[in-house]
Amino acid sequence: PEASSPAGAEPLAGDKQQPLGADTSDQRGEQPDPAEDDISPGSELAVAILGRPNVGKSSLLNALAGEERSIVSPVSGTTRDAVDTPLETPDGRKYLLVDTAGVRRRGKVAGRGDPAEQAAVEQSLQTLGRADVAVLVLDAAEVPTAQDFRLAERVAERGLACVLVVNKWDAVEGKGTDTSREFEDRIRQGLRPVEWAPVVFTSATTGQRVPKILDAVSAAGAEYRRRLPTATVNLVIREALAWRSPPGQRGKFGRVYYCTQAATSPPTFVFFVNDPKLFPDDYRLYMERQLRSAIGFEGTSLRLLWRGKPAG
């Protein structure tokens, strides 16, 4: 029978390895890809530049391509009419800007609210399937909008790394010492699905802080591909349980037996528990935030999967 003591009293098997036959697919049928675990941290990062029309995506793309980068000839992408642009920095970092032809083609459409804007946003979203990192471009004059939120939602749903780029920063008047912090707070509040993403304030036309974008992309990509030892993961989870136990339901309490990282790209953690139904959404979000607080993972989505496992 189920004990009624809180989860914090249940020891975690911190050195216990993931059972070989464990089912790591989540309730939506997602399955971590073991092949992604072998990606070298120094390998090419696929980067999708997306955002609403008229936020300066095309100008930003041109600024990135011209910022002391050696540009390889554009190569055909895997989707119709897509052209990808490889870039390499002087220190050897490699990037593949996905569907650069599409970014330029969709750069200017009718004003906000026009059906053409919706179509352009939909086309931008199609590039996410081939990306590791999404660079979501925002307009400093109007952030965040409902379309910005929708794009952020899709980035998180895809499980990508993300960098938020606030373009046209040079056009913001009356900036003070706290202006960027206030903007960043507003952006994080308005774009909750990617509140973990770094924010870069830039101007594509002047080149202000453009190099910082690729620095942020590299850092986010490294976190996206990061793997942790099971013992480290369980140490964090044990402390999180000590601070806050799962809520009980009719005298039954959730127990976490152990947790392991099942995949990277994005980092995917499987919690083996007595009953997944005893862990509501707010508690799952708490666990994600504890992982981020203790370990980092700035700039990347995380996936937390919860699996029922009998005790013993």
PLM features: residue spans?
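C-terminal-of-GTPase-core extension/linker across diverse P-loop GTPases
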Residues: 1-98, 106-122, 126, 130-136, ...
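Activation of the activation-loop gatekeeper triad in protein kinase-fold domains
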Residues: 101
